[in-house]
């Protein structure tokens, strides 16, 4: 047997090679699982702290106000009314299936100066989606957001903050920058109150923060949006007392170069997001 074949198959012949393959199979499957689900660890606070661009850390004098899980006709209009009264704008991460049912709400969001962004098509766990579903659904949601709002969306936030490899690639192919949050209100929890929401947000509130709240109970208990709504005036007031302006992600200074340049750098492995990702998970930037 030629030497290179002996090395490839093993000196014990094909049977020995098969035994080696069987032994390596669990390790290979584990590596594939890590490749798929590894990015999902980004929802954990220690990981997000190592990925400031992904977490949404922005300008020091600004706080980005963001809402997930809408639009819902029973709650989103109330948030829009309150934001109008407060003179604030925000970014709404919408679900495609809800925007499809209530496009008028999407138009109102944009018409009142807020920003639409992509939260996916449905509020499912990205880690258990069959192959290809996330790519199709993220693309479908992005197209709908653009059709309703008249502006190509810039941001993607996965449900539960679980950023699978497929979701990451699908978002980037659509020119969407994945962004999570630096602080949330835990407004979906049973027993949440305006006071608890404000206290939870305030614990991590500082310049450059991205705040996550919910304008819908689509993925939580009925009425769970009320504490967040009632906490808004005090939250905006607290930001003002800290000398911080409140607004959408588009005004937050997240990320680096314009989208076209960023996309080109992503594909050659040199975008800010890619470098941070590599630094966090491999200890290198790939330069």
Indicate where each model-derived feature is located.
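Charged helix-capping and loop-helix junction motifs
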Residues: 131-138, 192-199, 225-232
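Active-site beta->alpha N-cap acidic-glycine motif
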Residues: 41-127, 133, 137, 144-149, ...
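His/Asp/Glu-enriched short active-site or ligand-binding loop at hydrolase and phosphoryl-transfer sites
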Residues: 162, 168-204, 244-255
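A short acidic, helix-capping loop that chelates divalent metal ions and anchors anionic groups
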Residues: 124-129, 187-189, 218-222
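N-terminal membrane-anchoring alpha-helices
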Residues: 2, 6-55
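Divalent metal-coordination and catalytic microenvironments
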Residues: 68, 83, 92, 116, ...
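C-terminal domain-boundary segment and adjacent tail
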Residues: 41, 45-58, 85-86, 100, ...
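Active-site beta-loop-alpha junctions enriched in small/polar residues
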Residues: 70, 95-97, 121, 158-161, ...
């Amino acid at each position: 047997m030629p030497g290179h074949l002996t090395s490839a198959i093993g000196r014990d012949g094909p049977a020995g090679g098969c035994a080696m393959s069987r032994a390596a199979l669990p390790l290979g499957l584990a590596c594939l699982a890590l490749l798929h689900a590894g990015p999902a660890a980004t929802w954990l606070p220690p990981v997000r702290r190592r990925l400031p661009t992904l977490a949404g850390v922005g300008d020091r004098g600004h706080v980005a106000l963001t809402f997930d899980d809408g639009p819902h006709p029973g709650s989103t209009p109330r948030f829009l009314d309150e934001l109008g009264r407060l003179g604030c704008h925000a970014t709404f991460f919408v679900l495609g299936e809800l925007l499809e049912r209530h496009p008028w709400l999407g138009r109102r969001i944009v018409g009142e100066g807020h920003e639409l962004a992509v939260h996916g098509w449905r509020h499912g766990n990205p880690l258990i989606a069959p192959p290809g579903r996330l790519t199709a659904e993220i693309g479908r949601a992005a197209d709908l957001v653009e059709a309703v709002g008249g502006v190509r969306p810039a941001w993607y936030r996965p449900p539960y903050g679980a950023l699978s490899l497929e979701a990451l690639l699908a978002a980037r192919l659509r020119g969407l920058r994945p962004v999570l949050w630096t602080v949330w209100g835990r407004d979906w929890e049973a027993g949440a109150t305006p006071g608890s929401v404000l206290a939870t947000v305030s614990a991590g509130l500082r310049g450059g923060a991205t705040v996550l709240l919910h304008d819908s109970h689509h993925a939580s208990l009925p009425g769970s949006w009320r504490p967040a709504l009632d906490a808004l005036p005090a939250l905006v007031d607290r930001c003002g007392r800290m000398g911080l302006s409140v607004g959408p992600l588009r005004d937050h200074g997240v990320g680096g170069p314009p989208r076209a340049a960023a996309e080109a750098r992503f594909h050659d492995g040199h975008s800010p997001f890619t470098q941070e990702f590599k630094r966090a998970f491999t200890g290198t930037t790939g330069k």
